[in-house]
From Swiss-Prot:
Record's protein name: 1-aminocyclopropane-1-carboxylate oxidase homolog 3
Organism: Arabidopsis thaliana
Annotated keywords: Iron, Metal-binding, Oxidoreductase
Family: Belongs to the iron/ascorbate-dependent oxidoreductase family.
One Pfam family here: DIOX_N
Residues given in the record as Fe cation binding sites: H241, D243, H297
Amino acid sequence: MEMMKIDPLFDRASELKAFDETKTGVKGLVDSGVSQVPRIFHHPTVKLSTPKPLPSDLLHLKTIPTIDLGGRDFQDAIKRNNAIEEIKEAAAKWGFFQVINHGVSLELLEKMKKGVRDFHEQSQEVRKEFYSRDFSRRFLYLSNFDLFSSPAANWRDTFSCTMAPDTPKPQDLPEICRDIMMEYSKQVMNLGKFLFELLSEALGLEPNHLNDMDCSKGLLMLSHYYPPCPEPDLTLGTSQHSDNSFLTVLLPDQIEGLQVRREGHWFDVPHVSGALIINIGDLLQLITNDKFISLEHRVLANRATRARVSVACFFTTGVRPNPRMYGPIRELVSEENPPKYRETTIKDYATYFNAKGLDGTSALLHFKI
């Protein structure tokens, strides 16, 4: 096991506090002209390891599959069934897939990415007004939600907003990206309901099963900004983790960096023009009793000269009150395949996930029977 060198002059707690109190995030560091990554962002080399060469039996696993959703209007039952089978295989083996012809216009995707850039590239004084660690706020701008609990900080800033089930009031959102956030989240909600129909059928259930379980009821939007990193081999954009959602819809940038971990190996996710990246979250793995899997993933530090942006929309009600208990779906368990997880509320799962932070271990282990 690697031992981290201890510097007696390095006061991590003080440096974290000083960084947070600037209220300008990683973007503020870059704007100030830093040429070295501060120690609070240094990750152990074991966490930064580059992908090992694939053994011969895994060479066929190039990357996550890309699935055509037919504009969400399958006129041909065979094409719909083919898409369901592709989703079934991807959700069971990868937990990730890209979708094209998904029904969200390319123009809207570009406007959403521009909205993220516009917010993060405002003046520091304007951004500071939104910076907070009060997680009860509707709109939140900060750097690293787990800054004070994670082993190392990530080279990334984020703004987040709960978009459903309670739609935010216009005055809750920054004017610079207000309209596009509202419109984009509506489109993602519609796409999510459609995907949950296909996922239900892939499980052998009625099309409305997962939607009736309120899997598509809540939506949390996280808009990430990854500034160029002067020493990308020392840190990460996002640490290794799995998502505490039912499903995540990710709008990526042309600048690549996302990697998915499968069978002990890291796979790059390539840019596919106009595609959205879909991944199974922990809660969907839990209720499907491991029929679908929530794989760990990470984002490498940005080596480009331009900032990388992404928008992750998580289908979950998070820490908002929701008394419904979630456990393995009754139709998916039997004497031969008993429940593997205990029941939990979404709030309890999210609270445990947030307290644990992005430490490279799955929160699902805590809920195993």
